[in-house]
Amino acid sequence: MRGPREARRGSLLNEPGLIADGSVLIRDGRVEEVGPTRRVENLKAARGAVEIGASGRVVMPGFVDCHTHLAFPPPGLARTDAASALNAVKTSTARSLATQMGNCLQAMARHGTTTVEAKAACWGGQSAGLKLLRALSLVNHDPVDVVATLLFCLPARGSGPDGAEAAVEWACEELLPVLARRRLAQFADIEWSPEASRLGPIRRYLETAARLGLGCRVHADGDGPAQAAALGRELRVAGIDHLENLAAGELGGVAASGPVVTLLPGPAFHRGSRPAPARALLDAGAAVALGSNFNRSQGPILNMQTVVSLACREMGLTAAEALVASTINGAYALGRASTAGSIEHGKPADLIVCNVSDYRELGCHSGMNLVHLTMKRGEFIYQEGAVAPLAAERLRLAW
């Protein structure tokens, strides 16, 4: 997947950089060389290397899931019940929350994800988000890399402009400085709201986060996504996410914007609603990434293979576009393109071996795990296990 040093757009999304009969030479957890097998195996550095066969399988970069809500309250509570969710977080220990998150990360690793963005929501004036971020810090690199994001949610509509201004005032003066100082998050995200009275607070939040050295994202899952993209382009945010409500006449402005557009086919499939206009965005020149939006209430899918399949079936992406969008473009959305998303010389050896003979088969299956091996920094963190037959005496049925 070598290519330009920027997120892929247009025809480049259909060029995954395939190598037929290829090999990867790994040394000290990093890619030493990648290319045709005949050339790689004749390198002096390859002498004495341990060979791991992958004949008949596809070797590809580990998935980069660039949009999840991994840092959610304990099971059984949705964000719609904000008071109960906040209380549950407050009464839980960071360690117990970390255990819950760690279990999800292990499941992600089994399904081929090696880098994941994880949002911790903060509902204005509450510090529960800090505890969720502390819990995330306990599970980073175990077993995958976690890019922590604070998602700031403005007060409910109808609370008036003063409510939004007061919430952002608190976030800018107290919350964001703590995040930056303690390095609890790499990104600051904010839920988009198109009301004129809220544009000022949203702008202030993003500008303050950028000034403190945090990356910025915009959560545009409601009305007015084109306005969100315009502000994101102006402020040079890293990504604009969701965009399910984007109108046809707004495609050009969004596609021309600098930020990577992260699309989420899972929630639309789960709810039976209309997904974002992915095909139109791609044709208009947008740099598109794919994320799972994993959370228990609205998107209980953490398998990026399923996300790829849904993107092909429900959004009209080609298999190549979905592959690029779920790896290197996801890495660009997270500012991790130098360390994730492709198999290139010098990059960490984050890769997966899949039980398919052609990468295009990834878009033909849904709800399956096609991953045979998952490697993180040159170490296997997951290996597919054999299904052992049961002894005959254990197969006797009792009637």
What are these regions (language model features)?
Residues A85-G102, Q106, T114-Q227:
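Metal-coordinating catalytic core of metallo-dependent amide/deamination hydrolases
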Residues H67-A71, E191, H219, H242:
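Histidine-centered divalent metal-coordination motifs
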Residues G215-C216, G222-S342, C354-Y359, S366, ...:
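Active-site-adjacent C-terminal substructures of enzyme catalytic domains
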Residues M1-L43, E361:
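N-terminal metal-binding scaffold of metallo-dependent hydrolase/deaminase domains
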Residues V31, G112-T113, A185, V237:
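A structural motif
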Residues P4-E15, S326-I328, H345-W399:
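C-terminal cap of metal-dependent C-N hydrolases
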